[in-house]
């Protein structure tokens, strides 16, 4: 497919007469068309929600556009949580996934009612000590270890990653969280970056659904959603994080 710039050289020449360079110029129509296409593609699933990675483009105007299509915010820092709140996103539209998380960030995420995604097994006790309870809805990040391989070769090496919980840790984490008051559970995974093949998505979804069946059998937890995460880059600029089965 041939890609055409959304703006012409003549239009750019006119724009710079008013706005000095450098500046960012966004294609609002393209953003809206893509947001609409994603929403329509998964309309068969009434529980679907796309969560946009705020760190990719922390621009309130763009977030407000995506909000019109019922998208949520994927946040990884206090600042991103603040930005999401200022744009009017409520807790169920905010997914908080972070690493080496300071206490004040967990506390603020809980205050907003955001869905907290725990990256590490030790975060269970830390979260409880920080906010005084375990939220009714909680998510955990899964790391299967080994390598993540598609038909065209190895995509990434989760076994070398310090992020996420092993299957055994995840099972134990769900049991502990349930005993501490959690009622609804989610599973998050981010196994490869810069994927350019459609094979990645169904393969990851299949692995996660099989995992959920096992988690349900071994913990009895009510697993409400899967947060399937992915990062793409186009010219090192654009990144999007997907949650197609939330």
Language-model features: where?
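A structural signal for short, well-ordered beta-strand segments and their strand-loop junctions
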Residues: 117, 139, 186, 227-229, ...
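A charged N-terminal "starter" segment
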Residues: 1-136, 175, 179, 183, ...
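Anionic group-transfer/hydrolysis microenvironments
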Residues: 29, 55, 76, 121, ...
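Short, well-ordered, mixed-charge alpha-helical segments that flank or form enzyme active sites
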Residues: 82-83, 102-105, 124-127, 146-151, ...
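Glycine-rich, aromatic-flanked loop segments that form ligand/cofactor-binding clefts
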Residues: 133-147
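Active-site loop/helix belt of alpha/beta enzymes
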Residues: 144-236
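Positively charged, low-complexity/disordered segments
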Residues: 235-246
């Amino acid at each position: 497919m041939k890609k055409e710039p959304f703006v012409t050289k003549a239009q750019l020449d006119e724009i710079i007469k008013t706005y000095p360079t450098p500046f960012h110029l966004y294609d609002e129509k393209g953003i809206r068309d893509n947001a609409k296409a994603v929403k329509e593609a998964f309309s068969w699933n009434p529980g679907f929600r796309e969560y946009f990675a705020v760190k990719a483009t922390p621009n309130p105007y763009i977030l407000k556009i995506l909000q019109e299509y019922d998208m949520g915010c994927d946040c990884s820092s206090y600042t991103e949580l603040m930005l999401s709140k200022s744009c009017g996103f409520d807790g169920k539209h905010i997914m908080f996934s972070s690493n080496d998380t300071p206490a004040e960030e967990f506390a603020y995420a809980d205050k907003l009612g955001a869905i907290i995604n725990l990256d590490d097994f030790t975060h269970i006790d830390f979260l409880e000590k920080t906010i005084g309870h375990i939220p009714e809805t909680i998510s955990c990040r899964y790391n299967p270890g080994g390598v993540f391989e598609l038909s065209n070769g190895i995509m990434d090496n989760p076994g070398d990653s310090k992020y996420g919980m092993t299957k055994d840790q995840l099972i134990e984490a769900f049991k502990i969280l349930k005993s501490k008051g959690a009622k609804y559970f989610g599973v998050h995974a981010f196994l490869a970056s810069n994927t350019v093949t459609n094979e990645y998505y169904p393969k990851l979804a299949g692995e996660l659904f099989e995992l959920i069946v096992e988690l349900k059998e071994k913990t009895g937890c009510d697993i409400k959603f899967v947060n399937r995460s992915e990062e793409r880059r186009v010219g090192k600029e654009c990144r999007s994080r997907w949650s197609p089965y939330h």
